[in-house]
Swiss-Prot record:
<feature type="domain" description="Collagen-like">
    <location>
        <begin position="31"/>
        <end position="109"/>
    </location>
</feature>
<feature type="region of interest" description="Disordered">
    <location>
        <begin position="27"/>
        <end position="114"/>
    </location>
</feature>
<feature type="modified residue" description="4-hydroxyproline">
    <location>
        <position position="85"/>
    </location>
</feature>
<dbReference type="GO" id="GO:0062023">
    <property type="term" value="C:collagen-containing extracellular matrix"/>
</dbReference>
<dbReference type="GO" id="GO:0098888">
    <property type="term" value="C:extrinsic component of presynaptic membrane"/>
</dbReference>
<dbReference type="GO" id="GO:0005581">
    <property type="term" value="C:collagen trimer"/>
</dbReference>
<dbReference type="GO" id="GO:0098978">
    <property type="term" value="C:glutamatergic synapse"/>
</dbReference>
<dbReference type="GO" id="GO:0006956">
    <property type="term" value="P:complement activation"/>
</dbReference>
<dbReference type="Pfam" id="PF01391">
    <property type="entry name" value="Collagen"/>
</dbReference>
<feature type="modified residue" description="5-hydroxylysine">
    <location>
        <position position="48"/>
    </location>
</feature>
<dbReference type="GO" id="GO:0098890">
    <property type="term" value="C:extrinsic component of postsynaptic membrane"/>
</dbReference>
<keyword id="KW-0325">Glycoprotein</keyword>
<comment type="function">
    <text>Core component of the complement C1 complex, a multiprotein complex that initiates the classical pathway of the complement system, a cascade of proteins that leads to phagocytosis and breakdown of pathogens and signaling that strengthens the adaptive immune system.</text>
</comment>
<keyword id="KW-0399">Innate immunity</keyword>
<dbReference type="GO" id="GO:0005576">
    <property type="term" value="C:extracellular region"/>
</dbReference>
<dbReference type="InterPro" id="IPR050392">
    <property type="entry name" value="Collagen/C1q_domain"/>
</dbReference>
<keyword id="KW-0176">Collagen</keyword>
Amino acid sequence: MEGPRGWLVLCVLAISLASMVTEDLCRAPDGKKGEAGRPGRRGRPGLKGEQGEPGAPGIRTGIQGLKGDQGEPGPSGNPGKVGYPGPSGPLGARGIPGIKGTKGSPGNIKDQPRPAFSAIRRNPPMGGNVVIFDTVITNQEEPYQNHSGRFVCTVPGYYYFTFQVLSQWEICLSIVSSSRGQVRRSLGFCDTTNKGLFQVVSGGMVLQLQQGDQVWVEKDPKKGHIYQGSEADSVFSGFLIFPSA
């Protein structure tokens, strides 16, 4: 067994030594490059690379496309601030009449103010154009001032005033009123006689008055002689018809 194995080793060493000697003593030149081989099979796809940086915008050369379909409504935003009030709208249609209310409690006429007065001339002061009826007959609520001859309104409403004045001469009288200091001549009455007989000049009217308004009788400076005697009297009266609403 050892004989053949030893011979085999010796043969291999001899061949190797011979090759080394041959290479050192006689080296042949390199041959020409061979022809390119056929392309190999396509390799497997490589791994996906990382995302690159965004490129520069391209030049827009295409035609704008058609408008797309309307998208879905977005979520509701936060409530806005309260705006300014808008202009008033047109007047609406008249509503249906409401149900009749319950009957109220009966009123008491005694609780209502009822200003009224009557005054005559007995010993009036001389001078001036205001006809002063100095003697009071009735003065409910005391609206009449006998020292000045003026009625002063304390309850706004509609009033009736009247006068009857005795004279033997030509006479002209007027019912005069004032409101907030503005005097206005309301209505005038005149009568004439040439025989010196007694005559009565009378007049009356309805006035709407506010609180503080005044009413009086005034004579014409040239035609204002009033008879003064005990056998006949001149009278000035007034009263509230109904108060203002």
